[in-house]
């Protein structure tokens, strides 16, 4: 994963001292810290896209797989396994991606919001895509429910879109994440930073059991 060079800032918070993408200002990392206390992290399985490199479909000569295009199904698979436990062991990132392909939901980039909602419904999960306020996001996570976040250019993606899963809150009110494409799981993010880097008008999918 991404190797983070950290420096201890004068305020004794560990601050990343670089921007991983050239088009993203290091100031965007302000307030991102190494999570000192992860007691608020929900017991969510950690799955990575790069563990699923097998081609699922070829579109215009391009081989597509969970590795290239499955951040959405990987984020959703983690959520399904969290909510449904052993009964959802078949809900792997590649199985969900294959389902999306079979159902004609996949056109060559990532999956859209409605596709992820349709797949979630198979597992009796309710989804609501919202703009998300700081208070609602924190309350939702503290209640033990997950949020899929569709991130735009910034810390999680260079120029396209990328889905991550919000999986908890630190005692000082920052958000813990499972990123299916990196090992940024040791970091805690200010809610406003996630809101600012949202890809769409309604980038947050609030998940809960039906």
Language-model-detected regions and their locations in the chain:
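A general structural signal for well-ordered secondary-structure junctions
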Residues: 106, 126, 146-147, 200-204
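Active-site-adjacent structural segments surrounding the nucleophilic cysteine of cysteine proteases
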Residues: 1-105, 153
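Noncatalytic regulatory segments and standalone regulatory/sensor domains
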Residues: 19, 23, 30, 36-38, ...
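Mid-length scaffold segments of soluble, non-membrane domains
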Residues: 97-132, 142
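Active-site-adjacent substructure of cysteine-protease-like catalytic cores
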Residues: 129-176, 186, 209
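Short, flexible active-site loop motifs that bind/organize anionic cofactors or intermediates
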Residues: 66, 127, 184
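Hydrophobic/aromatic residues in well-formed alpha-helices
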Residues: 93-96, 116, 137, 194
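Solvent-exposed, acidic/flexible segments
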Residues: 64-73, 89, 93, 109, ...
């Amino acid at each position: 994963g991404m190797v983070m060079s950290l420096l201890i800032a004068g305020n004794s918070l560990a601050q990343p001292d670089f921007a991983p993408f050239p088009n993203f200002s290091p100031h965007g990392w302000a307030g991102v810290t190494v999570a000192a206390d992860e007691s608020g992290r929900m017991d969510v399985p950690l799955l990575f896209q790069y563990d699923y490199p097998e081609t699922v479909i070829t579109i215009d000569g391009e081989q597509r797989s969970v590795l290239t295009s499955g951040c959405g199904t990987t984020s959703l698979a983690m959520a399904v396994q969290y909510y449904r436990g052993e009964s959802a062991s078949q809900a792997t990132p590649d199985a969900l991606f294959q389902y999306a392909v079979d159902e004609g939901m996949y056109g060559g980039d990532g999956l859209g919001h409605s596709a992820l909602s349709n797949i979630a419904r198979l597992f009796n999960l309710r989804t609501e895509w919202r703009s998300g306020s700081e208070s609602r996001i924190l309350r939702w996570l503290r209640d033990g429910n997950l949020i899929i976040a569709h991130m735009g250019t910034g810390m999680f993606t260079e120029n396209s879109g990328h889905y991550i899963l919000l999986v908890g809150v630190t005692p000082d009110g920052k958000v813990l994440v499972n990123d299916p494409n990196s090992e940024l799981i040791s970091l805690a993010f200010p809610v406003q930073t996630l809101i600012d880097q949202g890809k769409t008008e309604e980038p947050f999918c609030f998940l809960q059991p039906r």
